Design a protein with these regions (language model features):
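N-terminal domain-start signal
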Residues: 1-209
Length: 209
């Protein structure tokens, strides 16, 4: 990767890092005596919070998701190769595919669980799940969705969405790694996959207990 090509991105990322909650700000939120007090403290930071709306809806995740998406979109506009950002954001794409597949297989509307982040829009992913085809996503993603469908049609397992999207998330990471052919990306991808596997192992161990 050309360091000069990423100089503008580096500057933007440093600015965004400075907008992260400081230890003092986070502690101030944690010791708040009420939700309203916590939201008012958060409102004084870079997070855009409609205090009254959150108090009425009790839905806090959309605030965090919206902030994350703003930062993602800002970096996406500047980055020379979007594949680099995919290394970190493709997990949200596969999360959304899981949600949409489970919604399709179960007949339940679960779309509110989607996270508005990643290179591919909700409409694009929804069209992929509905038709098992798309001109706007990589072939590996289409292949994963088709395999999940085949498993569900053969065995009726809702878990097919989890099993195949997890598997193809790893495959997609490896594909990005091979395509970019950068040692630092290879190391990052290895660490990410190792951490996911460790998390899965710990979760499975706890469930057996």
């Amino acid at each position: 990767m050309n360091d000069l090509a990423y100089s503008g991105v580096n500057t933007t990322v440093r600015i965004l890092e400075q907008q992260l909650l400081s230890k003092e700000q986070l502690n101030g939120i944690l010791v708040s005596k009420s939700l309203q007090q916590a939201l008012e403290a958060l409102q004084k930071t870079s997070y855009e919070v409609d205090v009254q709306e959150v108090l009425e809806s009790r839905q806090f995740d959309p605030v965090l998701d919206a902030h994350l998406k703003r930062n993602y979109d800002e970096v996406l506009e500047l980055i020379p190769d979007a594949s680099l950002l995919d290394v970190f954001s493709i997990r949200y794409t596969y999360h959304n595919l899981k949600v949409l597949l489970k919604s399709k297989f179960s007949g339940k509307d679960l779309k509110h669980l989607c996270i508005p982040l990643g290179r591919y829009s909700f409409d694009t992913l929804n069209q992929l799940v509905e038709t098992q085809d798309s001109l706007d996503v990589p072939d590996i993603m289409i292949e994963g969705v088709r395999e999940a469908y085949a498993d569900f049609e053969n065995f009726g397992r809702l878990e097919a969405a989890d099993v195949f999207m997890d598997r193809y998330y790893f495959k997609h990471l490896r594909l990005i790694d091979r395509t970019m052919n950068q040692e630092v990306i290879h190391q990052i991808v290895n660490i990410m996959i190792d951490m996911e596997n460790i998390t899965t192992l710990i979760r499975a161990t706890k469930q057996k207990q």
